[in-house]
């Protein structure tokens, strides 16, 4: 008997906080027959909220994956986070989707987070269905919600389904002329037929509608109540129809992408992979780089929130591997065959704090927990300060910090203490400078001579390195050692922060054979680099955000006048409907206070969209961070610093 090949579709459910995305996932599983009873966010019995903290707070933090099947179509549901600080996780999840359901609460309308998610989906060309949830609440006016979507998201919507007074959903067909006009706008052939009075057949309209939805130029609107299972069967029908097409390649060559890493309660490392082409079998050896392979020893897929072991995976499938080598964004197989899709850059951590266990005996356990958490979330980084021995934690936003701390307490059972977060600064040289330290010239104890120059570069350039010393004069091992020393030296500038936006040139090098070793060059290079920066001086840079602020017109004056109070620079203004859009930039350290102020005086009617712009010169006069010591070079550093002070 011939095996029926499943069509696999990966969809994402995205929404602002409390719009009901986890409840919708439960309802989809229930209506498709995958689960026998509906879980509840309030009671903590949902299938996809796996972390204790998620159940406690009623919001989805990690990306949970489950699936259901209708006839010969399998749908993997990626239930994505809804909190601002977790957009990095959202963006990673978006890259594996064939389509998205964007939830909008009928009561709350389009929220700030809804706009951010819609912008991200459009930027990555992912087809979208709008699902208006909670229509069974009192005081709902659907035409107002439609207008809200048009004003704040897109005019290109088509109402495909609504409800009658008894809350029984029905599907709108193509009998209404306005439905025809919405579908055929932009298609000259169909528009001409319609204009001259020729009949448009349903097949033509459906084909044009599907093509426009796939090209992200039309967005169908559906309605319902996930909590009370209203409109869910119709949503399942449209998901499993021709609306979403699998993003996969016609190739036998294997290609898959790692988009998520997590740890199970018993400490097993789980790696999530989306397959785009080829078939992966148990015990296959797979390339993950030019020099590295992994062997597939265990392979799972998620069904009803549970892991099920499988022997093979087909294109389109999301699989889970137990593997210690795979990292986020690794490609399994042929990297060239990965579908092109614009990847939104993950922002850099902008804040840091210290974190310590209340009981010193739990310090090692805390470090182990941080290792697991940071492995799952690259936006969370940590290190142990070698001066104070404190654990320094860097992160994107305060909600991320709060969730991380609660996770450490609830999952790992470690009571912790933290300090108030501070901004992560960077440094850039003020002018071009050079410095040389010669061999056998005190206080240089190393058998090496190094001459370096540093030149400031425009903001956002990063570190550039060039060697003017030929390999014929100084061999590769010495040259590599100089680069390693410079890389180490760039970790700490004059204020103790990382250096950036400069060109470092290796201009002169000398060694004595046979006494000189690469270690001599490795130790001397950061000392020479520091002296060059002392000659040039450095300036502090801080993270800036670009923003779009939407405020009702009556609050424009207040929002504009408050900008300078929070160090914001408004670059442009636009009028859209009853709102004014303020476009500008602001230091990351000020955005939360400005956002809170906007929310307060507009009574929650403002929207603030932000993206990391990069680092810019700060007006903060000084912000020192203690240097991390190095016993092998610090004595020499201090001697050169003392000499060059005079």
Curated annotation (Swiss-Prot):
GO terms, biological process: response to antibiotic; ribosome disassembly; translation
Keywords: Antibiotic resistance, GTP-binding, Nucleotide-binding, Plasmid, Protein biosynthesis
InterPro entries: EF-G-like_DII, EFG_II, EFG_III/V, EFG_V-like, G_TR_CS, P-loop_NTPase, Ribosomal_Su5_D2-typ_SF, Ribsml_uS5_D2-typ_fold_subgr
Organism domain of life: Bacteria
Residues annotated as binding GTP: 15-22, 79-83, 133-136
Entry keyword annotation includes Metal-binding: no
Domain tr-type G: 6-247
GO MF terms, alphabetically ordered: GTP binding; GTPase activity
SUPFAM superfamilies (UniProt xref): EF-G C-terminal domain-like (SSF54980), P-loop containing nucleoside triphosphate hydrolases (SSF52540), Ribosomal protein S5 domain 2-like (SSF54211), Translation proteins (SSF50447)
Pfam families assigned to the protein according to its UniProt record, in alphabetical order: EF-G_D2, EFG_C, EFG_III, EFG_IV, GTP_EFTU
UniProt xrefs under NCBIfam families: small_GTP, tet_protect, tet_protect_M_W
Similarity-based family: Belongs to the TRAFAC class translation factor GTPase superfamily. Classic translation factor GTPase family. TetM/TetO subfamily.
PANTHER family, per database record: RIBOSOME-RELEASING FACTOR 2, MITOCHONDRIAL, TRANSLATION ELONGATION FACTOR G-RELATED
Role of this protein: Abolishes the inhibitory effect of tetracyclin on protein synthesis by a non-covalent modification of the ribosomes.
Protein name: Tetracycline resistance protein TetS
Annotated source species: Lactococcus lactis subsp. lactis (Streptococcus lactis)
Primary gene name: tetS
